[in-house]
């Protein structure tokens, strides 16, 4: 079979990236819109704690997927993926008109509509890791990196949209008596939360359309079979086959020779290698990086950044979200296949993470507060920390690709388990024991 054209390959990478964009865009969008919705919802700034619990409950979606695989074995991931996408689109579309509706629960008003729809979206997003990733086992490893690039966009684009909206803008006017800062003045957003959720719905519709386009291209994609017993499609030229074989030979989870030559057979007879030392280490590494980037560090981001000002906080959020796509681009060009190298990068990421955790513990008066150097250091630390850990996660998942569908399914589970453990570990110190102290706007607690 002739090698696919450059245009078709570029289109496929684009569709895979847009497909990955829909994985966590809904929940990420809710998080970045919290500063707007808390003004009108009865929970106020306790809403993030409620939302953390709701997102954790979203892991119940994994049980639904497990039940589906038991009742419909061999049906693949297409149906669960489409269900996830429909739930995401419908959930965000309903948020637009209903997010501000409240109802009495146990004698107190609560955001019943907002939290219920957030639970639906959390279940869809949590389920995406164990449905989207196994689907990509039908494609060569470079497309997996495009998927993680899109997953990074699922965090970046809602952040950019929130910045355009003008979330969190305030001014500290001087008090007329003693010249100190008076009460903060909040600027109104450029458009309401309903418009934000409609824009988020449009992003998810685009992602769902990209998946449909991917299915239409599937018979022409390299290394993809249209059916379990159908003919296998070759990568193309002998040179491409040799290059793919060299790449697969470097993987710690080795595939059969037929896959290394550029074909994807039905079941993977070497899936047991997932339980080798290499496979277990890579899965543990993915769980650890997910715990840090999806659970531990997000819980303390406001404590580490807000003492340096709203600008530092917004720069850390947006540029930190951009670090994920940047790491994916880097992995496309330079992929670390050495376990020792991945360990070294993880230690480097832990160094940045330890600095950020120290800033959060020392809040509201961390070192270099009120200086430009402090702002630069905290923003740079967030960007480098997330970039390093994102690269490690992409590299580990690319190496796990050699184990086929079972390995990518296990990778998705590792991501979810790590994220859940990280969030669960940080909930008591942040929401129950209040170990971290926040800094109030327009108040200087560090003065003489």
Swiss-Prot record:
GO annotation (BP), single: riboflavin metabolic process
Known outcome of mutating residue 296 to M: Riboflavin transport is unaffected
InterPro entries with a match to the protein in the record: Riboflavin_transptr
Glycosylated sites: 178
Catalysed reactions, as listed in the record: riboflavin(in) = riboflavin(out)
Residue spans of biased composition, Acidic residues class: 240-250
Keyword Flavoprotein: no
Keywords: Cell membrane, Glycoprotein, Host cell receptor for virus entry, Membrane, Receptor, Transmembrane, Transmembrane helix, Transport
GO molecular function (one): riboflavin transmembrane transporter activity
TM ranges: 14-34, 47-67, 79-99, 124-144, 147-167, 191-211, 280-300, 315-335, 342-362, 369-389, 407-427
UniProt disease link: Riboflavin deficiency: A disorder caused by a primary defect in riboflavin metabolism, or by dietary riboflavin deficiency. Riboflavin deficiency during pregnancy results in hypoglycemia, metabolic acidosis, dicarboxylic aciduria and elevated plasma acylcarnitine levels in the newborn. Treatment with oral riboflavin results in complete resolution of the clinical and biochemical findings.
Name listed for the protein in its UniProt record: Solute carrier family 52, riboflavin transporter, member 1
Organism: Homo sapiens (Human)
